[in-house]
Amino acid sequence: MAKFELYAEVDVSISGHQYPIIICRNGLIDPELINRFITSKQVLIVTNRTVAPLYLGHLQSVLPSKQCDVVILEDGEEHKNQRSLFTIYDSLIQNKHHRDTSIIALGGGVIGDMAGFAASTYQRGVRFIQLPTTLLAQVDASVGGKTAINHPAGKNMIGSFYQPQAVIIDLNTLKTLPEREFRAGIAEMIKYALLVGGSFFERIQEALQQGLTVHSPELPLLIAECCQVKAKIVEQDERESGLRALLNLGHTFAHALETYTDYKKWLHGEAVAIGLYCAAVLSEKKGLLDKPIVDQVEKMLIHAGLPHKIPNSIDLIQLRELMSLDKKIKNNCLRFVMIKKPGACYIDDSVTEDCLHNALINVVEGERK
């Protein structure tokens, strides 16, 4: 059996609940590691049709003494819905899982969100372990305890905050990740670079210029740093009453774009990439951000092979209406994460309709001045 290799361990402490984020190789097939967090006799593995043929058998092999049931869902954001959620509940009930059961999320952010929401609500809460298999889930979606399903009216409209027992990031799973999915995950890394600034921004920028890949030697520690950044923020503000809202940089635009296209045009990270560029242009239009920094953001997204412009086929008025459903609205005011410079972001609820419209026009393909 391949030897377990540890790169980093990030400890998270939220509301008296502590758990580790373990960045490693061969963790998914290490019996000692997996069973350290699965103390129950019952386990439900939630995965999808893409990941199951690759890793399900390996995970099952390290749980030979457990009642190990499996739910295999359809792959994709469009399936993050009530129907999929109830498929998980049905399996738990039909297989007589008790309150001491454990749910394992084996997959990307969609699987983690749904399995986590099921864990937070089944019999008022059962143990939950994250095994993220996409870069986006490893650096962002699996960290911090947000769980949700989508509603036809908008993304992540029904959800909860629920922390896992552990997040085990096995970097070997990235070897089978499609190139497009890997690049989508880089968008969240760029987001962290903008939030943190300083040397981390420079390292991400340099890594992208050199061509960041699954095999880049700096990747494990960059992933660990992203996890550390998010963990530190979430520890201070678990339920997004203030500081944590900064993690939504670019997401007001991204969620509206995803809803507009029924989750069929872009991966989540690709929509975030467009959202980051929108946020940078909006910050420039409000007189906060210098244009050379906007150009830097654009170059980073281009180096990452990510989209950054809004297609001219999209109705900006309808897109603005979808933004009005955003969960971050407070006191009926739409709030944006604005950028003064890398490392200096803040929440702004005073963006005028004219300023927003002007920014959006300048982000449409072929329209940037």
UniProtKB/Swiss-Prot annotation:
Gene Ontology cellular-component annotations: cytoplasm
Reaction(s) the record says it catalyses: 7-phospho-2-dehydro-3-deoxy-D-arabino-heptonate = 3-dehydroquinate + phosphate
Cofactor: Co(2+); Zn(2+); NAD(+)
Pathway participation: Metabolic intermediate biosynthesis; chorismate biosynthesis; chorismate from D-erythrose 4-phosphate and phosphoenolpyruvate: step 2/7
Presence of the UniProt keyword Zinc in the record: yes
Coiled coil segments of this chain: none
Positions of Zn(2+) binding: 188, 251, 268
Keyword vocabulary terms for this entry: Amino-acid biosynthesis, Aromatic amino acid biosynthesis, Cobalt, Cytoplasm, Lyase, Metal-binding, NAD, Nucleotide-binding, Zinc
A single GO molecular function term of this UniProt record: metal ion binding
InterPro entries: Dehydroquinate_synthase (IPR050071), DHQ_synth_AroB (IPR016037), DHQ_synth_fam (IPR030963), DHQS/DOIS_N (IPR030960), DHQS_C (IPR056179)
Pfam families: DHQ_synthase, DHQS_C
Binding sites annotated in the UniProt record for NAD(+): 75-80, 109-113, 133-134, 146, 155, 173-176
Task of the protein: Catalyzes the conversion of 3-deoxy-D-arabino-heptulosonate 7-phosphate (DAHP) to dehydroquinate (DHQ).
HAMAP family, sorted: DHQ_synthase (MF_00110)
Protein name (Swiss-Prot/TrEMBL): 3-dehydroquinate synthase
Native source organism of the sequence: Legionella pneumophila subsp. pneumophila (strain Philadelphia 1 / ATCC 33152 / DSM 7513)
Encoding gene, per UniProt annotation: aroB
